[in-house]
Amino acid sequence: MPTKVTYIHVELLITDFIQNIPKTYLQQRRIFIMEQKMFCYQCEQTAGCNGCTGAAGVCGKDAAVAALQDELTGALIGLAKACGNNPKTENTDRIIIEGLFTTVTNVNFNAETLTAMIQAVNEEKKKVVPNCSSCMSPCGNTSNYDMKNLWNEPDEDIRSLKSLILFGIRGMAAYSYHAMVLGYTDETVNSFFYKALSFISYDLETEHLLPVVLEVGEVNLKCMALLDQANTTTYGTPVPTKVPLTIEKGPFIVVTGHDLKDLELL
């Protein structure tokens, strides 16, 4: 009974979120996509709470990088679909996770790196489905996804639910990556990335997308538990510790987020 109540509550919250998205917020996305300008509404820092537009976002990401991130996401969706009926290689999970993590806000705004990652994703897809690239009658089942199809989706509910799925698995990929570098993985978590990415490309109604949104939350909890296990097993359980707050002359090395492995190496 408590589980059922929780699910109903979450569904109502998501429905309320979708119904209250400003019309200008959605209209601007279509306008700026058509004009090839910057538009991103991934994070809570978006300009005017309507999304970042123009030459660059609040985070510093420019239109070219935003477009490359969309292209990378579309390539990841193509790779995920290719793995639907074909076995992965030993590197596919890592490429999916690293690719999603790369598109998280403020992680990587380097155009050359993004371009190289797009190429790596496409090369991995060729290994998974080697015959598709030379097929004389392509079926499109493993084609890279054009993110404009999502941003220009006329149904606001469908567009919003798919966006929630995308942004959710991007954040989950960050947790998964940090656990992975410490040698910890979870097949349930890894498999869900493929499912969620594929669902973004499918022509589905809200009643089919909402359960996937809820599943994002469920799997993310498993991923957070995985990261906690990785960190505590490797470095021990955190305890309150006094640290000096003295300001000293630099230079400094700043370590942020969950990069505990990087700190250990330093």
Spell out what each predicted region is.
Residues 13-33:
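Short, Lys/Arg-enriched N-terminal segments with co-localized hydrophobic residues
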Residues 8-10:
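Short hydrophobic alpha-helical segments enriched in small aliphatic residues
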Residues 35-265:
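Metallocofactor- and cofactor-centric catalytic cores in central/energy metabolism, strongly enriched
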